[in-house]
From Swiss-Prot:
This is Protein RhsB. Transmembrane segments: none annotated. Rhs elements have a nonessential function. They may play an important role in the natural ecology of the cell. The gene is rhsB. PANTHER family: PROTEIN RHSA-RELATED (PTHR32305:SF15), PTHR32305. Pfam families: DUF4329, DUF6531, RHS, RHS_repeat. It comes from Escherichia coli (strain K12). Residues 330-1186 are annotated as: 28 X approximate tandem repeats. Keywords: Repeat. Sequence repeats lie at residues 330-352, 353-374, 375-417, 418-438, 439-460, 461-481, 482-502, 503-525, 526-546, 547-567, 568-588, 589-609, 610-629, 630-650, 651-671, 672-691, 692-711, 712-734, 735-758, 808-828, 829-850, 851-871, 872-894, 895-930, 931-959, 960-984, 985-1019, 1162-1186. The keyword Repeat applies. The keyword Secreted does not apply.
């Protein structure tokens, strides 16, 4: 197919007549627009080389990029590949191209388009008004000469955006790669005629880029000289915002003279610098003209304050090759070296402060070696249709290719481990199928014309379909379950409405017909938010749904310099001449400063008090040493850049080993604990070993986990419904079958989670607990129905800000908020809590109408909490230079006490020198504390605490009365059995049950008591406590006396409401469901019947609606179709008994630790005081209320003294956990560590540290310096950073069928890194739960979509909620990245426009043993 219409106006018929009408939609003939080679930046290796071309390439190094519509972006692209039909050498020298170097050669029957990658694309001759379409490159080339294109043409609307003179000129050509534009205008430079010329000069046989025009008619113009030595060259650019740039050009003679003058002034002998250059190179004809510098000469927003230096400057070799690049500060940032024999052939390059990478070529000009002195080197061997790549670790990869020139594709890849993957392509090089190493094939169906994917079929036959409008914009996506995503656009192609699969509608409004920036958005709640923009497309103000405004200031380079929020809250940023962030100042003037090395790595963070956090880097910018407060951590890497050893502050080591595919295969911890991992051909984890504990992982055909076996016995089992949605997880815990069951509505939203526990022998149901969720008409999850409680309804305003809470029909809590939507007043009956904030936004006070509970907070310049004052006492806190809590000074009327906290360098608790001056302990190298002032400790080989015994001081006569605590664990390192003995007699024994997710669902406790014979022994019958959960939050505790249920503040682990119901009252509430009642009496003979599950689900929904007095129209229609009424069904329902309940409000501190329980009458029914680590100091409990919640996420176990903390058990006496972190080093280097500043940080999951209940990430101390102490890998682009993050987590996301998300951060040197991913839900994640560390800037976000096993088409595209996140001005991110189940890597900008879409991410289930 030629990419031309089947019948073209101007073509001749068989009988000689010309065609006057043609079809613009049907294309015929041989392919047109085929490139001479594959894209240089496509398949790359190392630093980088394109092995398909055998070329050294440097894709897209950007020197200038100011914000604005149609901005002038000066980027350099290098390729050593030489096309047979090159365009002339551009102003960056041989081998280099920039966007302005696009050129069209006009030959007799051929058009040759030279792109900015150094390639040639071949098109057939075009008649006026005709177009050619390259299906392999997705590129249109159109010749002017008509006022309109055919109405059915995809470019018809974009064509009309052009000025009429351009459309009508048959001598101009235009190119675009999208129906949304922009157009690249290909014209000629008007030459000034000579004095003796009478007739106009003939047009040249080529066209050059003269400008761009977008679909709004905005233009970017390249000004070319009409005469003189630079005739035809670009000497100026006017961008779409009317900024003017001057391009300073030089000739070879001028550069030679400048070199001679510099030598003379420097007193040196001039080097050989010829006045002329050869007129031809392997990269095309060369006129010797080079770009010397680019100046900004006019800026409409800053007309009086133009830069005093060029934005970029270039230096040249005597042979006219690009030698150096200087940034706008005048500092050299790049250098290049070229072959002595072949002009323009790059043999080395370096970034300033980085090692030099060198290259060797064969006689055909192909790269054969890539030499890296501080990392991996590569060799390349070329054979016909085969390229072998071998790195310096002797790992070999073989690429098998098919096709020629621009259609060459890798069809088979042999990996270093011997596995093979294969790909299939259509005739124009578009991917049709991929087969993984296990032989499973995923098929892709591209549209025959556009190449857009219309269908994806996975190996198990599941398919997703995508639909587009005539402008190639996605209009709907439909999956096997029939749910649909829909998008609508206006006539300019701007998104105006999106309907998500769950029915959630978002609308976008525009007030400027010449802009794609929305002026307002409306969400499903009807809330409207407005935005104003600068002429450069920068956000100036954002007005939320309440009319509150946030304003933004920027500098001319697009960097944000200030943010002004309501309530007087502002932040100011300062940058150096390189654009690196050097200072951040808050409203109160507290300033944090930043320092960098020559390579731009952040080397120091100076806090407002002058303390420094320092980081040292290796040659490639990887952190090798971090120092804070005299404590140092170090990291070592191998040649492949993989971490191979960590050295803690104590000098201990953790080591890592990898396989040939860079997968972790062994980890040996600081304490010697060794874990090993084995993978199958597709990379899935199939076996893990943990000090002899062997686990096997089993998967189904869709790569979903089906079960695990541990020590040969079945552990967890996963079950899925026909849609692939997870419905059940079960396992055996202490002989009991424990399961979790999930229910969803017709839109795939979670509506119920039920835990069940069955008897080991009889399988009788011992316990079940269900939490249900409901959604309002706008799709907000605003209702939760706890087990055996009325519905909890969250009252919101605007886009979901919390305004109140109801239990059933009873309003319980009301909130008042300030102009930042922060809580300022909370009301619960007579109880009122008033909250105030400092000018910097920190908590300043919490005052109650009960003065004794008032609290005032004081912070130091570093943002550390240093004092909490109340009417009863004042506590002052001191910290080390590493941010660790070192002491507490408590003063009151009759009290003045100082309590010190001492730790070794790694954060392990030590005896305090003041209290124990004779102690010689200085550190615990393996982080296993063996003794303290009170106990001796023993651990097993997994690092689990197994025994704790009373310490008998030296000199004390032993009486064998010491108490011994013993701890026993299951294969998942969960505590399942605890005993405490004295005189070798048991005092207490307890056993614990867990569900498959690791949540504790029951405990049984036997206590020592006197039996009928008078002997003391453990009770025969245990005290049994059952637990119920809603996600990761413990909501129900029930024993034989009462049930206590907790309602938490939304999105946190801070308890809000406590509901207690006597067990006897609960028994009266037992009733049949409507479905059960109908089934038991539904037979014709009066006997029972069994309803199908779908009918049971519909009846359950109807019953919940009747009980809530909110019967939906859908349910009424369904009943009517059955000849029934709501009243009839209501008469079939068992009566509802409302039990007597005690309701209290939790009054908590700033962390979420309960301080008091307030009755509905406003009285304090219980109150307590704790130390900083959660130890109970005092308690007033006149009503004998059971209040077991401690620090957020923790439950006190009276029998052991430990706090259950979701994934682990916390020992408050030591301020640490008794087992190692299940997520390994992701939770911090000390695997036992709780946060070392418990005044500000919490850890509600027993995993990684949280700064507070809302953020969910550790940002203090060294963690704040590097985010993750292994030292986050840093990149030069957001794109590369996001790809790295998603490449690491996409497999695990597929395994768990959960979304993961995090942020992309920009450090002060302008480099990027990702924060650690946090787990979301099956259909939702929130990247801001993993915030950027202090001193860095969030610029983007990334997330995954889990597994596509449930057939949801939108797993492959951005959802409406995704787009809300990126478009929200509150979030202030530039883009949002997505890793899909099929391995697609996608991105949209903050206007919802797709900016990246390519394959390459893992698309099979692989998990890390620690996870």
């Amino acid at each position: 197919m030629s990419g031309k219409p089947a019948a073209r106006q101007g073509d001749m018929t068989q009988y000689g007549g010309s065609i006057v009408q043609g079809s613009a939609g049907v294309r015929i003939g041989a392919p047109t627009g085929v490139a001479c080679s594959v894209c240089p930046g496509g398949v790359t290796s190392g630093h980088p080389v394109n092995p398909l071309l055998g070329a050294k390439v440097l894709p897209g190094e950007t020197d200038i990029a100011l914000p604005g519509p149609l901005p002038f972006i000066l980027s350099r692209t290098y390729s050593s590949y030489r096309t047979k039909t090159p365009a002339p050498v551009g102003s960056l020298g041989p081998g280099w191209k920039m966007p302005a170097d696009i050129r069209l050669q006009l030959r007799d029957n051929t058009l040759i388009l030279s792109d900015n990658g150094g390639r040639s694309l071949y098109f057939e001759h075009l008649f006026p008004g005709e177009d050619g379409y390259s299906r392999s490159e997705s590129l249109w080339l159109v010749r002017g000469g008509v006022a309109k294109l055919d109405e059915g043409h995809r470019l018809a609307a974009l064509w009309q955006a052009l000025p009429e003179e351009l459309r009508l000129s048959p001598h101009r050509y235009l190119a675009t790669n999208s129906p949304q534009g922009p157009w690249w205008l290909l014209g000629w430079c008007e030459r000034v005629p000579e004095a003796d010329e009478v007739l106009p000069a003939p047009l040249p046989p080529y066209r050059v880029l003269t400008g761009l025009v977008d679909r709004f008619g905005r233009t970017q113009t390249f000004h070319r000289e009409a005469a003189g030595e630079f005739s035809g060259e670009i000497t100026g650019v006017t961008d779409g915002a009317w900024r003017h740039f001057r391009l300073v050009l030089t000739t070879q003679a001028q550069r030679a003279e400048e070199a001679r003058q510099q030598a003379i002034s420097g007193g040196t002998e001039p080097s050989a610098f010829p006045d002329t250059l050869p007129g031809y190179t392997e990269y095309g004809r060369d006129n010797g003209i080079r770009l010397s510098a680019v100046w900004l000469t006019h800026d409409p927003e800053y007309p009086e304050n133009l830069p005093a230096a060029p934005l970029v400057r270039y230096g040249w070799t005597p042979r006219g090759e690009l030698a150096v690049v200087y940034d706008r500060s005048g500092k050299q940032v790049r250098s290049f070296t070229y072959d002595d024999k072949y002009r323009g052939r790059m043999v080395a390059h370096r970034h300033t402060g980085r090692p030099e990478i060198r290259y060797r070529y064969d006689s055909d000009g192909r790269v054969t070696e890539q030499l890296n002195p501080a990392g991996l080197s590569y060799t390349y061997q070329y054979e016909k249709d085969r390229i072998t790549i071998t790195d310096s670790l002797d790992r070999r990869e073989v690429l098998h290719t098919q096709g020629e020139a621009g259609l060459k594709r890798v069809v088979k890849k042999e990996h270093a481990d011997g596995s093979v993957t294969q790909s299939q392509f259509d005739a124009v090089g578009r991917l049709r199928a991929q087969t993984d190493a296990a032989g499973r094939t995923t098929e892709y169906s591209p549209d025959v014309v556009t190449g857009l994917i219309t269908r994806i079929t996975t190996p198990d036959g599941r398919a997703s379909a995508f639909y587009y409008n005539h402008h190639n914009q996605l209009t709907s996506a439909t999956g096997p379950d029939g749910l649909e995503l829909r998008r609508e656009y206006d006539e300019l192609g701007r998104l105006i409405q999106e309907t998500a699969p769950d029915g959630d509608i978002t609308r976008y409004r525009y007030d400027n017909p010449h802009s794609d920036l929305p002026c307002a958005t409306e969400d499903a709640t009807g809330s409207r938010k407005t935005m104003t923009w600068s002429r450069y497309g920068q956000l100036l103000s954002f007005t939320d749904c309440s009319g509150y405004v946030t304003r933004y200031d920027h500098d001319r380079f697009g960097q944000m310099t200030a943010v002004h929020r309501e309530e007087g809250l502002s932040q100011y940023r300062a940058y150096d001449s390189r654009g690196q962030l050097i200072a951040v100042k808050d409203t109160q003037g507290h300033e944090t400063r930043y320092e960098y090395n020559i390579a731009g790595d952040l080397t120091a963070v100076i806090a407002p008090d002058g303390s420094r956090n320092g980081t040292q880097y290796d040659a490639w910018g990887k952190a090798v040493r971090t120092t804070q407060g005299g404590l140092t951590r170090s990291m070592e890497y191998d040649a492949a850049g993989r971490v191979i050893r960590l050295t803690s502050e104590n000098g201990s080591h953790t080591t890592f080993r990898y396989d040939v595919l860079d997968r972790l295969i062994q980890e040996t911890g600081f304490d010697g604990r060794t874990q090993r991992y084995h993978h199958d051909l597709t990379g899935k984890l199939i076996r893990s070993e943990d000090e002899g504990l062997v686990t096997h992982w089993h998967y189904d055909e869709a790569d979903r986990l089906t079960h695990r076996t541990v020590k040969g016995e079945t552990a967890e089992r996963w079950q899925y419904d026909e849609r692939g949605w997870l419905t059940d997880i079960s396992h055996i815990s202490e002989g009991h079958r424990v399961a979790v069951h999930y229910r969803y509505d017709e839109k795939g939203r979670l509506t119920g989670e039920r835990q069940t526990v069955h008897h080991p022998q009889t399988e009788a149901l011992l316990w079940q607990h269900e939490t249900r969720h409901a959604y309002n008409a706008q799709g907000l999850a605003n209702r939760c129905i706890p087990d055996s409680l009325p519905a909890v309804e969250w009252l919101t305003y605007g886009s979901g800000y919390l305004a109140g809470m109801k239990l059933g029909d009873t309003p319980l809590v009301e909130y008042t908020r300030d102009r930042l939507h922060r809580e300022t007043l909370r009301s619960f009956g007579r109880y009122e809590l008033t909250t105030a904030y400092t000018p910097a936004g920190q908590l300043q006070s919490q005052h109650l109408n009960s003065l004794l509970s008032d609290r005032d907070y004081t912070w130091n310049d570093n943002g550390e909490l240093i004092r909490i004052s109340s009417p009863r006492q004042t506590r002052s806190y001191s910290y080390s230079t590493t941010g660790r809590l070192t002491g507490v000074h408590t003063t009151a009327a009759n009290l003045d006490i100082r309590i010190p906290y001492a730790t070794d360098p790694a954060g392990n608790r030590l005896p305090d020198p003041e209290l124990h001056p004779d102690s010689t302990l200085s550190m615990w190298p393996d982080n296993r504390i063996a003794r303290d002032a009170h106990y001796l400790y023993r651990y097993d080989r997994h690092g689990r605490l197994t025994e704790k015994t009373d310490l008998i001081p030296e000199g004390v006569i032993r009486t064998d009365d010491e108490r011994t605590h013993r701890y026993h664990y299951d294969s998942q390192h969960r505590l399942v059995h605890y005993t405490r003995t004295q005189y070798e007699e048991p005092l207490v024994e307890s056993r614990y049950l867990y569900d498959p997710l690791g949540r504790r669902v029951a405990k049984r406790v036997w206590r020592r008591e006197r039996d009928l014979t008078g002997w003391m022994s453990l009770s025969r019958k245990p005290q049994v406590t059952w637990y119920g959960w809603d996600g990761d939050r413990l909501t129900t505790i029930q024993n034989d006396r009462s049930r206590i249920q907790t309602i938490y503040q939304p999105g946190s682990f801070t308890p809000l409401i406590r509901v207690e119901t006597a067990t006897g009252e609960l028994a009266k509430t037992q009733r049949r469901s409507l479905a059960d009642a109908l089934q038991q009496s539904g037979g014709e003979d009066g006997g029972s019947v069994v309803f199908p599950p779908v009918l049971v689900q519909m009846l359950d929904r109807l019953e919940s609606e009747i009980l809530a007095d909110r019967v939906s129209e859908e349910s009424r229609r369904w009943l009517a179709s059955c000849g029934l009424t709501v009243e009839q069904m209501q008469n079939q329902m068992d009566p509802v008994y409302t039990p007597a309940r005690k309701i209290h409000l939790y009054h908590c501190d700033h962390r979420g630790l309960p301080l008091a329980l307030i009755s509905t009458e406003g009285a304090t029914a219980w109150c307590a005081e704790y130390d900083e680590w959660g130890n109970l100091l005092n308690e007033e409990n006149p009503h004998q209320l059971q209040q077991l919640i401690r620090l957020p996420g923790q439950q006190y176990d009276e029998e052991s003294g430990l706090y259950y903390n979701r994934h682990r058990y916390y020992d408050p006496l030591q301020g640490r956990y008794i087992t190692q972190d299940p997520i390994g080093l992701k939770g911090g280097w000390n695997l036992y560590g709780y946060q070392l500043n418990p005044i500000s940080d919490i850890d509600p999951l027993g995993l990684s540290m949280w700064e507070d209940a809302k953020s969910g990430a550790c940002t203090n101390g060294l963690c704040g310096t590097l985010s993750a102490m292994i030292g986050p890998d840093k990149f030069d682009s957001i794109d590369s950073t996001a790809y790295d993050a998603l490449n690491k987590i996409n497999s695990q996301s597929i395994c768990e069928d959960k979304e993961f998300a995090g942020l992309i951060c920009k450090d002060n040197s302008g480099r990027y890194f990702s924060t650690a991913p946090n787990r979301g839900e099956r259909k939702g994640s929130y990247p801001f739960n993993s915030p950027c560390p202090n001193g860095t800037e969030k610029v983007s976000a990334y997330h995954t979509h889990g597994a596509d096993s449930h057939g949801e088409y939108w797993d492959e595209i951005f959802s409406g909620k995704d787009e809300k996140i990126v478009k929200s001005k509150d979030n202030n991110i530039k883009s949002f990245y997505l890793g899909t189940p099929s391995g697609n890597f996608k991105a949209i900008d903050n206007h919802g426009k797709e900016i990246t879409n390519r394959k390459g991410l893992p698309n099979v289930c692989r998990v890390h043993g620690n996870m």
